[in-house]
């Protein structure tokens, strides 16, 4: 039996989105059975250097209370960060992949998904070995680089349909699933937190370097490093579930209490710093892999 860990990182301003996500997650867990071993790891990040609690009208306890009631009956190893030990979702992923699970699902708080999604992903993942990724499909995303993941019913739609059409956006929750084809794509393409499932061996292989810090482009790094490995003959599979899609919620992003907390927004600073190191990290990974590859007898 494969053990699966679902990893979600929650900032205070995301608690309302996360509550909506958990409604779907509770439904999704109802389709699990005795052959499934699925655990949630949700990190509520109340780091005082990411939120100015002294200047915030509502305090940490408010979020702890809202958070704590969301998991009744769901197996979890959740954590609440009250100090400066966690700086973002990239760090949470880096720490999570070291835990003794066979595979991981990374999911952002703004993801809208069908209640059957988890069941479909698990069923496909149980048939795979080695390094693999199992992705939902997407309605037409930003540009043609995402075409490999496009749901078969949306291939002729304009780019941006997932963001511009609210019926499509929120339809992710109630979409009619007519058929699903688990198809392998010839490359790697994923958004790290798009309810994407990864084998532990994939992240052990490419890693999430410390240099990417608390918040950075670990998805780009993982994709590009994986592509290098595939060119050298390493077997990394990405399977797309063509027939069931996810979207991001571009509408309900601002919480009702937004004027009552004072975020200290370091995401751009963290991302820019990490992104500036990204190419060198990929080159370093490629160099080591090529050296290892050419050294083989």
Predicted regions: what they are:
Residues 8-20, 48-50, 87:
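Active-site beta-to-alpha loop of glycosyltransferases that engages the nucleotide-sugar donor
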Residues 3-9, 25, 38-44:
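Hydrophobic targeting segments
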Residues 36-51, 82-83:
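Short beta-strand/loop segment that forms part of the nucleotide-sugar
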Residues 114-116, 120-210:
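Conserved catalytic core of nucleotide-sugar-dependent glycosyltransferases
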Residues 102-112:
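Short beta-strand-to-loop acidic/aromatic patch adjacent to the donor-nucleotide binding site
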């Amino acid at each position: 039996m494969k053990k699966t860990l679902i990893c979600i990182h929650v900032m205070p301003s995301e608690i309302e989105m996360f509550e909506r996500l958990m409604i779907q997650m509770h439904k999704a867990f109802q389709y699990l059975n005795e052959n499934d071993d699925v655990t949630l790891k949700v990190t509520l990040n109340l780091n005082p250097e990411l939120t100015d609690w002294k200047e915030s009208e509502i305090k940490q306890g408010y979020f702890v209370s809202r958070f704590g009631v969301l998991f009744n009956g769901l197996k979890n190893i959740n954590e609440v960060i009250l100090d400066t030990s966690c700086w973002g979702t990239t760090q949470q992923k880096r720490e999570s992949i070291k835990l003794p699970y066979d595979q991981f699902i990374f999911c952002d708080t703004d993801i809208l998904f069908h209640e059957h999604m988890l069941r479909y992903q698990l069923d496909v993942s149980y048939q795979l070995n080695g390094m693999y990724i199992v992705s939902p499909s997407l309605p037409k995303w930003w540009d043609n680089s995402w075409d490999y993941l496009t749901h078969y019913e949306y291939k002729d739609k304009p780019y941006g349909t997932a963001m511009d059409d609210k019926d499509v956006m929120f339809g992710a929750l109630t979409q009619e699933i007519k058929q699903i084809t688990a198809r392998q794509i010839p490359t790697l393409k994923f958004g790290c937190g798009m309810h994407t499932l990864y084998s532990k061996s994939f992240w052990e292989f490419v890693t999430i370097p410390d240099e990417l810090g608390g918040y950075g482009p670990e998805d780009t790094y993982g994709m590009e490093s994986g592509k290098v490995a595939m060119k050298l003959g390493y077997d990394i599979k990405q399977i797309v579930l063509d027939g069931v899609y996810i979207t991001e919620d571009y509408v309900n992003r601002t919480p009702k209490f937004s004027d009552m907390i004072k975020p200290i927004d370091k995401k751009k600073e963290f991302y820019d710093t990490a992104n500036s190191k990204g190419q060198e990290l990929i080159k370093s990974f490629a160099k080591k892999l090529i050296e290892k590859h050419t050294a083989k007898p």
